[in-house]
């Protein structure tokens, strides 16, 4: 498969998959070289509580960024954030991939019901969330800054 404008001799990276579409048989590919990473969000997200890209990745990893964070989240029905994020310093975009997901904002509740529904909130807007059905959401936040992790049982986790 070649993209428009791509040299016919340019190598093509593919994610290697086993099993059928939607099965658990998919394999994440890894670093192709020091500047390219090919992966599968469903598997890669498990390593950092959903976070695929941000300041918390190793500096030599192509997924390291001080500018932006990206999270792939799979939430079971009735999953809820343990506590509100207060004193937010980032801007965030949350996109519903599947399911039914509610974002709680001060004085307002936003229900994402259809694939592609999204909400954006800026600096200083506290928030929380609740999965009304099993849901998959993609979150993009900027800039990428330490903090905000909800302490997990037995200590703080890498991200929230």
Across the structure, where does each feature detected by a protein language model lie?
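Short histidine-centered beta-strand/loop micro-motifs
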Residues: 61-64, 81-88, 105, 111, ...
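Short peripheral tails and domain-boundary helices/loops at the edges of structured domains
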Residues: 144-160
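Short, surface-exposed beta-edge/turn micro-motifs
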Residues: 90-93, 116, 134-135
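Ligand-binding loop in jelly-roll beta-barrel domains
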Residues: 123-148
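A short, N-terminal "cap"/entry segment at the start of jelly-roll beta-barrel domains
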Residues: 1-77, 81-84, 157-160
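Short, conserved beta-strand element in jelly-roll/cupin
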Residues: 86-102
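Short acidic-glycine-tyrosine-enriched beta hairpin
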Residues: 107-123
């Amino acid at each position: 498969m070649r993209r428009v404008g791509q040299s016919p001799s340019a190598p093509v990276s593919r994610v290697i998959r086993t099993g059928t579409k939607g099965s658990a048989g998919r394999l994440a590919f890894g670093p192709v070289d020091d500047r390219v990473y090919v992966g599968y969000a469903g598997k890669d997200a498990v390593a950092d509580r959903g976070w695929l890209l941000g300041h918390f990745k190793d500096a030599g990893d192509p997924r390291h960024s001080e500018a932006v964070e990206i999270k792939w989240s799979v939430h079971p029905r009735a999953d809820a954030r343990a506590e509100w994020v207060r004193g937010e310093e980032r801007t965030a975009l949350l996109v519903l991939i599947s399911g039914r997901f509610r974002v709680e904002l001060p004085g307002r509740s936003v229900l994402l019901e259809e694939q592609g529904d999204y909400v954006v909130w800026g600096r200083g807007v506290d928030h929380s969330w609740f999965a009304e059905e099993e849901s998959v959401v993609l979150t993009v936040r900027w800039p990428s800054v330490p903090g905000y992790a909800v302490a997990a049982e037995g200590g703080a986790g890498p991200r929230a």
